[in-house]
Amino acid sequence: MIMSVPLFHGSIVALLTPMTHGEVNYQEIKNLVEYHIQAGSHGIVAMGTTGESTTLSIDEHVKVIKKTVEFADGRIPIIAGSGSNATSEAVTITKLLNGVGVVGCLSVVPYYNKPTQEGLYLHYKAIAESTELPQILYNVPSRTGCDLKPETIGRLSEIPNIIGVKEATGDLTRLPLIKTLAGEDFIFLSGDDATGLESMKLGGQGVISVTNNLAAADMAKMCELVLAGNFAEAEAINQRLIDLHHDLFIEANPIPVKWAAYKLGLISEPSLRLPLTPLSETAQPTILKALQKAGLI
């Protein structure tokens, strides 16, 4: 391992990308970075799924990451979303991030083209060999249509700068298996807010969180409590947030979280780029109810 675990722990926000009339609003990114620093978030992922990376150009993608690093100014670790379903493009993006100031990269399993496990191994090997930046694998089969198997994760863990995985399967049985195959030092970050607390109780180091966009202080406190072994207090916070954990996926992420952030005044409009469309009117009462239960409104 080439990085220490504390850089990748606790409540790491999967940061949304504010837009005004469909264009990236960098001032609002700056505002969000300040919000997360003040709230005690343990890290920021820029340009992940929640950040709408798939609807931005490569130039926009890299600029958002660079500006996020600039705004953070060393006060909070920034992890860059850098994946693609084309290995060559993922390598290109990763190389562009060398020297930018991110602490590592989060690289999603190639989507749509459904590679074999050997193809996935070679994909990640090529990316890792193109950089010295620490790499975190990102497994989210519900979106990609392809599952990175624990056995393949174990193989990939032998590559020095592949240091961890974001598991968004919600399947807690995978955690001990991955730890067995990849080693106890291999970082396990939950990509599923609903099971994030339980994954940390089982030995995971944290959660890359959508809910954190709205409830940053609560998520940070919950993670700190569970990692310190204070499970009852952590569970009390988690129960207030549990409806958000689920309902922020009532429509495709980041549609609900952008609308919720707008309602909370964190961004000026819930603008998205097609093919993503605004939250439907029928879904809005569900999100409002979850925000109320969380004590956010």
Swiss-Prot record:
Recorded GO CC terms: cytosol
Assembly behavior: Homotetramer; dimer of dimers.
Name the job this protein performs: Catalyzes the condensation of (S)-aspartate-beta-semialdehyde [(S)-ASA] and pyruvate to 4-hydroxy-tetrahydrodipicolinate (HTPA).
**Record-level Gene Ontology MF annotations:** 4-hydroxy-tetrahydrodipicolinate synthase activity
For this UniProt entry, which residues form the secretion signal?
A: none
Q: What is this protein called?
A: 4-hydroxy-tetrahydrodipicolinate synthase
Q: Where is this site: Part of a proton relay during catalysis?
A: 49, 112
* NCBIfam families named among the record's database cross-references: dapA (TIGR00674)
Q: Which Pfam families match?
A: DHDPS
Write down the species. Answer: Haemophilus ducreyi (strain 35000HP / ATCC 700724)
Please report which protein family the annotation says this sequence is part of.
Answer: Belongs to the DapA family.
UniProt entry tagged with the keyword Chaperone: no
Residues that bind pyruvate, according to the entry? Answer: 50, 208
What PROSITE patterns does the record tag this protein with? DHDPS_1, DHDPS_2
* Catalytic site positions: 138 (proton donor/acceptor), 166 (schiff-base intermediate with substrate)
Q: Which UniProt keywords apply?
A: Amino-acid biosynthesis, Cytoplasm, Diaminopimelate biosynthesis, Lyase, Lysine biosynthesis, Schiff base
Q: In which pathway does it act?
A: Amino-acid biosynthesis; L-lysine biosynthesis via DAP pathway; (S)-tetrahydrodipicolinate from L-aspartate: step 3/4
